[in-house]
From Swiss-Prot:
The keyword Ribosomal protein applies. It comes from Hydrogenobaculum sp. (strain Y04AAS1). This is Large ribosomal subunit protein bL21. Pfam families: Ribosomal_L21p (PF00829). GO terms for cellular component: cytoplasm; ribonucleoprotein complex; ribosome. The lineage of its organism: Bacteria, Pseudomonadati, Aquificota, Aquificia, Aquificales.
Amino acid sequence: MYAVIETGSKQYLVKEGDVLKVEKLPFGENEEIELPALNIVKDGTVKFGGKVKAKVLSTAKDKKVLIFKHLPKKHSKKLRGHRQFYTKISILSIGE
């Protein structure tokens, strides 16, 4: 059985036991949360709606992404860095 969940304007195909990195969620560590499922597939039949239970494992920053801008013939350079927050979750169960 697997489900499609949506969090942070992104969709993920998950099954029980999966560990995902999603955009930052406002929950603490070891907290159990319910995420809405767009659809659930079980034994070849598709059901729309439902809930997916997950556990928050940690919240941290991702790797640094460097943004480099260079304007030719202007002697202008800019180097910026960005680290996005993410939440690591574990899928506990997929509800009906």
